[in-house]
Amino acid sequence: MDNKTPVTLARVIKVLGRTGSRGGVTQVRVEFLEDTSRTIVRNVKGPVRENDILVLMESEREARRLR
């Protein structure tokens, strides 16, 4: 990874559910470590649980809610 690429750290506060055609993606609510008042919903591929720290390459995009 390039040192010039800005990244944002976020902590998983709640696992919302599984999504994707085969359930391979997990939808989670995360709060940013720099600004704990700001939370967004993201899709995560792979194993994830509450209190995990995610490295977000792009922090403005929010996932659509599960139906």
Curated annotation (Swiss-Prot):
Q: Does the keyword Ribonucleoprotein apply?
A: yes
What are the recorded GO MF terms, alphabetically? structural constituent of ribosome
Matching Pfam families: Ribosomal_S28e
GO annotation (BP), single: ribosomal small subunit assembly
Q: Which InterPro entries match?
A: NA-bd_OB-fold (IPR012340), Ribosomal_eS28 (IPR000289), Ribosomal_eS28_CS (IPR028626)
Q: Which PROSITE patterns match?
A: RIBOSOMAL_S28E (PS00961)
Alphabetic keyword roster:
Ribonucleoprotein, Ribosomal protein
State the family named in the UniProt similarity comment for this chain. Answer: Belongs to the eukaryotic ribosomal protein eS28 family.
Name by which UniProt lists this protein: Small ribosomal subunit protein eS28
